[in-house]
A protein has these predicted regions:
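Catalytic-loop motifs flanking and including active-site residues across diverse enzymes
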Residues: 73
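Conserved short "hinge" loops at termini or chain/domain junctions
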Residues: 1-70, 84-285
């Protein structure tokens, strides 16, 4: 049984336009119970973590994290259950439930409903993630590690590239691309250590104290802008922009960006450029 959606009354808070059940009729909760369990398992594995799920039901019903977690479970469950709700298995095969007072929904209406449920789920997930990031038990979970793999963990990433439908699906595609992009940027310019620091700071909102915090936030913004460019253009890194960030790292005050300055990556950018040397043919007074 679902821990987040324990009964029909809780379920109906998140399902609009449901006719009240008459005596003897199967409750909607009973009809979609398997889908609720699968949806909760998916949400737990992908977002919540077992630790967060264990304590969520103990929270007040008005708690934001509990509210949006329930909404996400119901939307995901209904997304899978809707195509089956009017089907029954008879001895002669599957049949469609008929009602003389209510016309069956057309294929187009059902498709619009499914798209609406998907959008509701994706919107709910985008609200849920920042709430989870502020939950102490979540910071060491597997879902946290997944979203900590890129500089921009938030689910509105597809919108920044002009995509509005199928946001969660599109996010996962972009997530994989960002990982590949950041591997290249880390190797050539910024180091794995610095990017790891920036990723964690953005997701968990742990930027440290002044005077270092503004430097790290600025570096995050500039590097993420480079990544967005590479996502849009599907091309190579913009070298001038990367060098500009590198120079800001090199010229930062002592004690700032030390996770970068102490590495071989930083050494790649030392002592470059022309120097006026008497031993060289181009020497000038």
């Amino acid at each position: 049984m679902s821990q987040l959606i324990p009964d029909n009354n809780v379920l109906l808070q998140f399902v609009p336009n449901v006719l009240k059940s008459v005596q003897g009729e199967t409750l909607l909760f009973d009809k979609i119970a398997p889908h609720l369990e699968v949806a909760e398992a998916w949400l737990t594995t992908t977002f919540l973590s077992e630790a967060v799920l264990a304590e969520l039901p103990t929270r007040d019903a008005n708690n934001k994290l509990l509210h949006y977690a329930r909404m996400a479970v119901v939307a995901e469950a209904m997304l899978h259950a809707v195509p089956q709700l009017d089907l029954v298995l008879t001895s002669n095969g599957f049949g469609v439930v008929s009602n003389t007072n209510i016309a069956p929904a057309s294929k187009e209406r059902v498709e619009r409903l499914l798209l609406s449920l998907e959008k509701m789920r994706d919107y709910t997930l985008s609200i849920l993630l920042p709430l989870l990031a502020n939950t102490e038990a979540w910071a060491t979970s597997d879902p946290c590690q997944y979203f900590e793999q890129t500089l921009y963990p938030w689910l509105d990433l597809p919108q920044k590239l002009g995509s509005t439908d199928h946001s969660w699906q599109r996010y996962q595609e972009l997530h994989s691309k960002l990982i590949a992009i950041e591997e290249r940027l880390a190797h050539d310019f910024f180091s794995c250590e610095l990017l790891a620091t920036l990723r964690q700071a953005e997701l968990l909102c742990k930027w440290g104290e002044p005077p270092s915090a503004p430097h790290y936030k600025r570096a995050w913004r500039h590097i993420f802008a480079i990544e967005l460019y590479m996502l849009r253009e599907e091309g190579e890194a913009p070298i001038p922009s990367c060098i500009e960030v590198v120079n800001s790292l090199r010229n930062a005050p002592d004690g700032i960006f030390e996770e970068w300055k102490q590495l071989e990556t930083a050494a790649l950018f030392e002592n470059h450029g022309y120097k006026n040397d008497k031993r060289k043919g181009g020497y000038w007074f």
